[in-house]
Amino acid sequence: EISLGLVGSEMCIRDRNGWFHYAKLYAATAGCIGFMMLKYKWSIGKTEWFKVFPFLIVAINILIAVCSDFESAIKGGINGGWWFSNEGVWLYGGWWNWLNGIAGLINIFCMTGWWGIYSSKKQDDMLWPDMTIWFIVAYDIWNFTYTYNNLPTHTWYCGVALLLAPTFANALWNKGGWIQNRANTLAIWCMFAQVFPLFQVDGIFATLPCLLYTSPSPRDRG
């Protein structure tokens, strides 16, 4: 745990590594490895049945965020809105988390054509042609909404820059390679965030993650 905080007259900022960041780190890394197996045709990456892997790992990544959204909705409902997450951040949960979680589930069912995944001629990319610009835009909007609601301390990094990087690459010079670029940038960010956690709360685009309220002592009340 890394903490700087507001207790009494002192400012308190807490940043903890909760379940979400670890789940995303391992899921994104698994995706990168699986995509390389398909791209370079390593071992089972040569087989036809392994083409279902990108769909499964992307679905798992989406479900991780969906579970986090539902967690915020439930705990926000129980606590009257505000609740203190295991990331050390005050979040405001409500019906919007339910809606965004459902949108994530719809995203999963909108992924098609995974049997058409193939490696480029020079094996530079794993290409998924059915990942159209419309799906990518819908995914980006859903994912940004998730980060805005649940990762407020670093939404600029993981919710804007991290989403736009593979989207621009797909639109301008790397058509069909969006999902592999998304996995690579996400895994790199997750590793960086774990090694340098204070960057998320002390960077130029960071926001104040928490203000802890402590009730006054009997001496103060007297």
Task: Please provide the spans of the model-predicted regions.
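Generic multipass alpha-helical transmembrane bundles of integral membrane proteins
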Residues: K51-G176
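Short, aromatic-rich membrane-interface segments at the entry and exit
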Residues: F20-A23, H154-Y157, Q180-N181
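Non-cytosolic membrane-interface motifs at loop->transmembrane helix junctions
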Residues: F20, G93, P209-L212
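Single conserved hydrophobic/aromatic residue that forms the stacking wall/gate
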Residues: E1-G8, I13, Y213-G222
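Helix-loop junctions on the outward
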Residues: R14-F20, A73-K75, D202
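An N-terminal, globular interaction/scaffold subdomain
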Residues: S9-E10, R14-T47
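Hydrophobic cores of alpha-helical transmembrane segments in multi-pass inner/ER membrane proteins
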Residues: L25-M37, N100-G113, L162-A165, S215, ...
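C-terminal transmembrane-bundle signature of multipass membrane proteins
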Residues: G159-R221
